[in-house]
Amino acid sequence: MPVPSIVPASLRLFLINEDYKEKGNPDLKHTVADNLDLRYEFFPKSSEQFMVGMFYKKLKNPIEYGLLNEGQDTYYKPMNFGNATNLGVEVDVMKYFNWFGIKANYTYTHSSITTEKRIMDGNDVKACTQTRPLFGQAAHVANLSLLFKSTKYGWEGQIAGSYTGKRLSDISNWYDDDIWEDGYMQLDASVEKSFKNGISLFAKASNLLDTPLIRFIQSGPRTENVNSERNNGNVIERKEWHGQSFMLGIRYKL
């Protein structure tokens, strides 16, 4: 039986990907959010829908993760950098044409937070501010699914694609030195065949495109002399492939 930790989470310290030490923050404040949502929904049939909405969120003390220099060490820790706002629109549609259907949704979010930064001016370090999106908030998120369903013949399947736009991955206390995660696409597929005796066979495939996850620092004065792999001029901090996965199975329903 595992022994529960008696060390508060806010005080723990350990390595994160062997790059930086992760450190808790006992001074972290809770996030308080004020939300305003406006939505219109229409359901022509039980299997069809149309939705369009607008939203506004005011976030006080949102919790973001960033890299902070303390003496000679750099720590990865949760912090409150200020107050933020999220404003956006979303659209969701699902429509069937006999055995074939389409389900799609798209969300645009304008995210904004102004934080204190440091910048080099010659040999001097000066304080400044910078307005940026909220940590982990992509401006564009979209999903599209092609659906296939035949109750008569016992077939059901879908091909689903998703896109997540560029977003902040780690916050730096230096101006224009944040680490970003590049936009990426994912494609999944599944199919299932049901039989009258309660048995069904299914197959699933995930991450068919195997799009790499790219983390980068945007090109600027601080990266001019960095000797590293680049993508569109940006310095690549990390590139990962998570691989494809496949599954075959059988189900039985009483």
Which functions belong to the PLM regions below?
Residues 28, 38-42, 89-95, 104, ...:
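Residues on the lipid-exposed face of transmembrane beta-strands in outer-membrane beta-barrel proteins
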Residues 55-59, 77-171:
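Gram-negative outer-membrane beta-barrel transporters
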Residues 6-14, 18-21, 62-70, 109, ...:
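Outer-membrane beta-barrel translocator domains and adjoining extracellular loop/strand segments
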Residues 45-47, 95-100, 139, 150-154, ...:
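Strand-connecting loop/turn motifs
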Residues 3, 58-60, 163-171, 193-254:
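C-terminal beta-signal and adjacent terminal beta-strands/loops
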Residues 25-29, 35, 42, 49-103, ...:
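Outer membrane beta-barrel strand-and-loop segments of large Gram-negative receptors
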Residues 21-26, 74-80, 88, 125-133, ...:
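Extracellular loop and loop/strand-boundary signature of outer-membrane beta-barrel proteins
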Residues 1-5, 44-46, 214:
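A surface-exposed, glycine/aromatic-enriched loop/edge motif typical of exported proteins
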